[in-house]
């Protein structure tokens, strides 16, 4: 079941008046509430959020940075998370019971996270155990549900982000002979390959057919990749790179490792959202860059670096649609309900799930 199926209508019904308010009036009200609430309110915002939302973030970052920020914040009573559902779940699990995590729009899910549900994962683990016994350890990208994080926690595994994937995959191989990486096959493949594992020692698990996709002796398999992907980064292609090389031969190409292996291999650089931001920041004035990641972030980088020539690797790219569900009207609505003493769209993860998921999260956080 996806998060969209779990949404209660009352939680996502933005009152009509927010559609008719001017941007200026909404921004004014957000500032007033932030000033009034002070440190009792904390607004983390992911880099992929719209500018209209990011401008009010108390901390902006990628998944790892926001997880660390959530874990360290003990002052705020209300954490209004401007990101997607799995990020708000992570914040809820890493904060105290007294802190309340709110997602301004409960429809802000993640298609990648929905590509691995707990029933599929338990079934896959059972079948893979028949083949490989006790030789596997699971790692899950943080872009996954709390239930999947809990699965990894109780099976000795951990979470990873694109910033620390190499560290965590290296650690995993000190624990077991084989790695099961979910839900993003591309990050898993690119990371394992960077660490020297040949492509022919990687298999793919298809959760829809409950089958292992691999040609060869299965005893040779070191990495089992879940057949999932990011719908945004899937849209960057080798053809995009060929077009840039042809029309702008002096342009650097930098992409996110959620792109497929062929795109990453053909690029000049690949790394996390933070890595991309830092690379552009440190690049010399006049340098040229084609960036393969989410469009809101690319546009923000372009605005912040007018001294550099920067374009999207895919000129027809669109933003992450679920991230974009968090907008200024929904942010203001969430804040005004808090101001009235109400709590809507509260993210509350089951206690048992939290305990097991935190095991996986802490195995990551203590190593980065």
Swiss-Prot record:
Domain of life assignment: Bacteria
Record-annotated membrane-spanning stretches: none
Main location: cytoplasm
Pathway participation: Cofactor biosynthesis; NAD(+) biosynthesis; quinolinate from iminoaspartate: step 1/1
A GO cellular component entry from the record: cytosol
Enzyme class: transferase
Protein name (database record): Quinolinate synthase
